[in-house]
Amino acid sequence: MSVFRDDFLWGGACAANQFEGAWDVDGKGPSVPDMCTNGSHTSPKWVTTGIRPDRLYPSHEAIDFYHHYEEDIALFVEMGFKTFRTSINWTRIFPNGWETEPNENGLEFYDRVFDCCKKHGIEPLVTISHYELPYALVEKYNGWASRELIEFYMNYCKAIFERYKDKVKYWLTFNEINCGTMPMGAILETGTIKGFEGSTADVPDNKQERFQALHHQFVASAKAVKYAHDNYPQFKMGNMICFITSYPLTCDPADVIANQQKMQITNWFCSDVQVRGEYPSYMKRWFAENGITILQQPEDADILKEGTVDFYTFSYYMSNCITTHKDTEDVGGNIVAGKKNPYLKASDWGWQIDPIGLRYTLNEIYDRYHLPMMVVENGLGAYDVKSEDGKIHDSYRIDYLRRHIEQMAEAVKDGVDLMGYTPWGCIDLVSASTGEMAKRYGFIYVNKFDDGTGDLSREKKDSFYWYKKVIASNGEKLE
């Protein structure tokens, strides 16, 4: 008998800016990803202030879900999805971000997507803002550095809440909001890159600006949650974390403290604000020691307290180690890197594979908050190569997912209230961090390549058939 609840939400996850394409179709305006070129594991993508004809912008076509959504959702149905995590592209609804009236063409597109899901019994799980800030808001306001974005965001939320009130139950206010605590978050999350053009590796890091922008996102998220609770009691509201589990590299107490502080800043800070509705005490010292002063309005404390989430969602891909000792080996990671764990193997991109860490993470989060939880991103980015028979035999991906689902089951046995699982990139899409197609996550292979070529045809990988059995058995059949 399965340990997962009978109504467990098995599914998959994607993001509008990474798979929709149609970047300037039907009134859509440019978002930050539309100004980002392609890159690779070894060569960072660029941000440009205008579209340059000598550059390739992968989000412009991506995998063209915009024109393939019925075909793609049919494949999700065949796998047995109970839920599909996707996002709404802000600039499809408000092309510049500040308009007072929404773009009807954009609203109608998501009507069609959600109707298609609901027709087949798939519950949409919708991220309101997933790394696609309107670029016009960057140019005029320097992104979330300006408090004015709170009301623009609320206008956007009100439009989509009312439009999709009978089609969407589960909402996430921001994707991986804690990326704002990291330098890369200036591009991905807060849009505090006004006037910047160059490699993503060279984005200037202004901590004061970054954390002030994050505060504005906290307030916007809380206001959206409270507005939803007051006007649409059927909604379940969340806000998603990029959870980067880390361990002390050694048993040196200095390493233990260093790791505790890293976990606080990277993971618990944003989690505490969204769940407990206030800034944690440990951040006061950190802000003081880093010369950061968060400007708040008198009403902000009440707004944060009144806008706490209903459930907790996070991404989990890997873990790393933290140390105060020098001369230790670095490894790659999701948004941030860390130190090499000698007990773990790594992916093609250097991300350390740690299934047991997922069980540990689930327990740590649940013990802290006692909220229902969903793992809304998890997966293996890998180079998929077609075999002589023309198929993708991705046993490595199956092994990765199997081992993580096994540890999810152990966490449920531990008492964790786990409500769903949506592996990332259920269909191949553009990487947010590197801007490449070669880093593939999907159960479905898309014939699209880093040079922009490909006929966009879809093909089932071995993992497609495996995940179908997993869902049909509610997580019992993992072989």
Spans of features found by a protein language model:
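Active-site region of glycoside hydrolase catalytic domains
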Residues: 1-53, 77, 96-98, 107-479
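A short acidic, glycine/proline-enriched capping/turn motif at secondary-structure boundaries
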Residues: 82, 91-93, 131-133
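Glycine-rich, proline-tolerant flexible connector loops at the mouths of alpha/beta enzymes
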Residues: 88-102
